[in-house]
């Protein structure tokens, strides 16, 4: 058995999927819908086949409205003999909806504070983030809040979105009094259109 011969005196900066600080945040429990051992902590994920229940790594065709958040390392998974941590298919996993977290980034990226946040949706880096827009990325509601840490991670902040805005159903305005000068021109599923002028409403 080999022995460790070198030791670092520096504390690593950031671990993929670790919360950046204790500022306001929300973590939802989701089920890993990947069939292999491809899910990792610190990846951006999208809705699976059961929105609000499971998540998967983004692929071609993924859209920002399906973005669920970033997988959180709850420090409950053991390393294997090679030092790797895997998330089993069907396992429950925390997903950060909003807040600050260390996320996986494209290996060649060098983000800076305030850079926009783009999720890579194709290729070997799918699920990682980058500061650069491209044909293989979608912009998600957030930003980089610091430079690259130890390894291919960087601190990011996901902005709060109501459930209605993120496409996960529910939330948003719950009464006409919450609306003001809104014209919903897209028919609802039952074929009705709600128009609210601020003083009255009509259904067509």
Which residues make up each language-model segment?
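Surface-exposed, low-hydrophobicity beta-strand/loop segments enriched in small/polar/acidic residues
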Residues: 1-175, 187
